[in-house]
């Protein structure tokens, strides 16, 4: 053995640790385009200074239409997302929910720290609050015997409502061409 003691110094090179994210739920509105925000995609990384650089869509939307802007590093406008497309920011993703649907919409994503994607994919759920849809109607014909009073009822009017709400009132927009139309309890009276 040597007469003196020596110090052996070992240096370690840092390696990138993959980032993580978390499942999240955001609120949207029926029949309304929803653009996501950066805050909708949680990002955590033990490597100091790392930040989210990409979001990759791994499983497509369960319903509706998910679109990507400037996907895969390009400069194109809004296009349909396909599996494994990535965007640089949460604001580069938007969802058009299915018409008249309040169903939750889910898709899966991974986050990237500039070097690697997260090891796991996470689910983003968009809930939708209902909005009242206007009812629809159509022209209708009521047959009657000449010189006989007609009393109209709700069933005489073609009516449809996507929420299933029963007819509440009728608004006359054009007056009769012949005869006398009388209203009972008009204007809420």
What do these predicted ranges mean?
Residues 24-28, 140-143:
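Short beta-strand segments of immunoglobulin-like
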Residues 1-17, 29-35, 39-51, 61-135, ...:
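Acidic, turn/loop-rich segments in luminal/extracellular domains of secretory-pathway
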């Amino acid at each position: 053995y040597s007469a003196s003691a020596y110090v052996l110094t070992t240096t370690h090179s840092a390696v990138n640790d993959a980032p993580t994210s978390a499942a999240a739920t955001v609120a949207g509105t029926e029949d309304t385009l929803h653009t996501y925000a950066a805050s909708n995609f949680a990002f955590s990384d033990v490597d100091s200074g790392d930040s989210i650089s990409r979001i990759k869509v791994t499983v497509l939307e369960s319903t509706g239409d998910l679109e990507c802007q400037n996907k895969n590093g390009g400069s194109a406008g809004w296009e349909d997302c396909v599996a494994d497309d990535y965007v640089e920011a949460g604001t580069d993703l938007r969802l058009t929910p299915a018409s008249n649907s309040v169903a939750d919409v889910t898709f899966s994503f991974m986050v990237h720290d500039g070097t690697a994607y997260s090891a796991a994919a996470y689910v983003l759920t968009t809930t939708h609050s209902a909005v009242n849809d206007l009812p629809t109607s159509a022209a209708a014909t009521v047959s009657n015997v000449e010189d006989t009073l007609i009393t109209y009822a709700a069933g005489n009017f073609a009516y449809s409502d996507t929420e299933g709400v029963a007819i509440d009132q009728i608004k006359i927009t054009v007056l009769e061409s012949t005869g006398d139309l009388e209203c009972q309890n008009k204007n809420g009276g």
